[in-house]
Amino acid sequence: MFQYHCLNPIAQKGLDIFDDNYKKADTLDDCQAVLVRSAKMHDMELPESVAVIARAGAGVNNIPVKECAEKGIVVFNTPGANANGVKELVLAGMLLASRDIVGGIEWVQREKDQEDIDKLAEKQKKQFAGCEIMGKKLGIIGLGAIGSMVANAAASLGMEVYGYDPYISIDAAWNLSRTIKHSKSLDEIYSKWDYITVHVPLLDSTKKMINKEAFEKMKDGVVLLNFARDLLVDEDALIEALNSGKVKKYVTDFANHTVAGHEGILVTPHLGASTEESEENCAVMAVKEVRDFLENGNIKNSVNFPNCDMGTCVAVGRIAITHKNIPNMISQLTKILGAEGLNIADMTNKSKGEYAYTLIDLESAASAEALDALKAIEGVSKVRVVK
């Protein structure tokens, strides 16, 4: 029997995938799995029993990923599960930035008691006029799950779409429309495009990547959209660019005191994945990842350990080992198993940066003594009997 705990409400459609071998717990005590959306986990004390954390969403800033890796806790996210919801909001943001739809709606609300509001509307509508997005140039920084969907949708609406992503995956490239043009540098993006939308993860290398230098290279009157992470944009430089007219509109999904209330900024309260469909898709993917890991030892979409798949566990003794990616580890593992008279039927070892993961199918179950010996190896963080 496995136990899981939800730190946030998780869509029931996902939880329904758990079978009778899983029990929902009210606390973290004795849980093997944790499901989370936005709850802050950096100051949480996790029990030794926790083997996996699944984030029902893409960003993992609220999870101490490195600390989890040190403890052998595999952290999953659900890339692409909320992509369509974010894509649709990006498109809405482009339209709202192109015409003063919000201002027009607010005007109607203010003047709703005027008897001749219909005639007033005809006189006042010019102040809310704007431009169409058809034929405009859109630059997309980052062509992952969301960026590629935005690219295809914008192209279908008649925009001239350019994409920049030096790390684009094969799958994402295959899914792009042939009409999407490739930009080889950020300088090309900044200098040519009418609209720029950012879809990259928040890393040390991307923090405040949209800065004063970047704004200086952009076309006058550019529209900037950020539905990825708030810290990708240097907001002090942004305010200067808005006040000078370099940036016409900034549309973001991240509210704070700097951007809220500025007339050149449209802010939504983190609505990107706030759709029923996105929440369900994220929950379903997260639960499937948890089950495959706990029942088979397989890893897919982990942010701190490598992908690893040995299929459905049918062996008498499959063990999963998280450890440092250091020399001589495999020989130490196999030496202990051999000394215990345990024959290896199948085995795989994968690494990701500082950390590695080993799955071993044995022809017979490992003894408690053998498992303790594996755990005692320097660099091994967790040894788990899958079956």
Predicted regions mapped to residue ranges:
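N-terminal Rossmann-fold NAD(P) dinucleotide-binding loop
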Residues: G147-S148
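Rossmann-like adenosine-cofactor binding region
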Residues: H42-M44, P166-T258, S274
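Oxidoreductase and adenylate-handling cofactor-binding alpha/beta cores
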Residues: K87-E106, N152-M159, M285-N298, T334-G338
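Glycine-rich Rossmann-fold phosphate-binding loop(s) that bind the pyrophosphate
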Residues: K136, L143-G144
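Phosphate-binding beta-alpha-beta segment of Rossmann-like dinucleotide-binding domains, i.e.
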Residues: P79-K137, N301-V303
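NAD(P)-dependent dehydrogenase/reductase Rossmann-like domain
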Residues: Y250, E263, L271-K387
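An N-terminal-biased, well-structured beta-alpha scaffold segment characteristic
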Residues: M1-T78, N211-E213, V223, D234, ...
